[in-house]
Amino acid sequence: MLIITGTGVTNVSLMWQQPLLMERNGIILGFVVRLSRVTSRDTIELTTAYTNITVAPLTPYTLYECVVAAYTSVGTGPFSSIIFTRTEPTSKSY
């Protein structure tokens, strides 16, 4: 399960759990994280060995689609369900 743990003006923090042992196709080597801008489909793809990441720099007040997948020596597994998040605006109006 992928969750948003924080958002800023130019960053998003994500956290997830490893796949269950019976769902793995070998030893997990790492994770692929993808964030796509909803309006333009521009995509950022990162890899990490950890189950959390902060992605930056992102565009302020922009809606992103986020997914994550584990990978092994066999290849990349299925991506998680899509979650959406929006970065914060550069300034707040009162």
Predicted regions located by residue number:
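Extracellular low-complexity, O-glycosylation-prone stalks/linkers
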Residues: 1-94
